[in-house]
Amino acid sequence: MPIRVPDELPAVSFLRNENVFVMASSRAKTQEIRPLKVLILNLMPKKIETENQFLRLLSNSPLQVDIQLLRVDSRESKNTPTEHLNNFYCDFEDIQDQNFDGLIVTGAPLGLVDFCDVAYWPQIERIIAWAKEHVTSTLFVCWAVQAALNILYGIPKMTREVKLSGIYQHQTLEPLALLTRGFDETFLAPHSRYADFPVEVLQQYTDLDILVSSEEAGAYLFASKDKRVAFVTGHPEYDVDTLAGEYQRDLAAGLNPQVPLNYFPSDDASLRPKASWRSHGHLLFANWLNYYVYQITPFDLRHMNPTLD
């Protein structure tokens, strides 16, 4: 089954050109099934690009998924047209009385910003608290992982001296877990962050199950035992050229960034990289939708009981 989005959303034509199955709302209304309601809190500056990336992964599932886009920052965006935000995004006040099967909170370029200095930090705290009662399962990505660990577990912000950027090898620690079902024993995934997620810190201060880790990148995938929250510290949604764009951006800003590890052929930034993480990203999101959302969410969202023993 496809993702279900508004007819006019730019991602519709973009993803159809990639042969991704996207169903516009006008057609979806003719199917007599209840789609999964998934809310995406998009914190990235280039919102249309991020929409395309996450919708691509959510589309590769036998489940019909009804997408609602959420924003929290009311300031004028430099990277996304205001018309697009007004047409396709809702504010928290619009949905705070609703329930959702799933919530995805994206990353944000805030790795060196203290939580107290994040303009919309109070809104992040409010949404994470709200999700406990209104969402079956929440998936946090990259910076959102750091934010959620602080809010839910009191873990302070931990920052690397040098930005982690590139494609890193990962080891599946719990191959029988539902979220890692079908994972290879080792696989590649992108990272782009200053945040640090040491395995030993998570083991000491939380009861989260650490499912995947990396010797270089630390904990990559972990989740609560009741499947209400899951965390991925990398960017399995990234396009093949996303890291290249970030590298060129940082160069232009005079930040003297390191060349992303294991990304450009022969570490030559003039050569086009190749994606080596797509299959993992699709499998991760399919597993989350199936085992953490679909299998435990109630048919009637008015009666939330999102726990699986």
Curated annotation (Swiss-Prot):
Enzyme Commission (EC) number: 2.3.1.46
Q: Where in the cell is it found?
A: Cytoplasm
User: Do you know which Gene3D superfamilies this protein is assigned to?
Assistant: 3.40.50.880
Q: Which reaction does it catalyse?
A: L-homoserine + succinyl-CoA = O-succinyl-L-homoserine + CoA
Question: In which broad location class does this protein mainly occur, judging by the first location in its UniProt entry?
Answer: cytoplasm
Show the active-site residues: C142, H235, E237
| Top enzyme category | transferase
Note the site residues: Important for acyl-CoA specificity: G111
Q: Which UniProt keywords apply?
A: Acyltransferase, Amino-acid biosynthesis, Cytoplasm, Methionine biosynthesis, Transferase
Q: Which domain of life is it from?
A: Bacteria
Q: Name one GO cellular component term.
A: cytoplasm
Q: Which residues bind substrate?
A: K163, S192, R249
Answer whether the UniProt record assigns the keyword Chloroplast to this protein: no
Give the metabolic or biological pathway: Amino-acid biosynthesis; L-methionine biosynthesis via de novo pathway; O-succinyl-L-homoserine from L-homoserine: step 1/1
NCBIfam families tied to this protein: metA
State the similarity comment.
Answer: Belongs to the MetA family.
Give the protein's function: Transfers a succinyl group from succinyl-CoA to L-homoserine, forming succinyl-L-homoserine.
Protein name (Swiss-Prot/TrEMBL) = Homoserine O-succinyltransferase
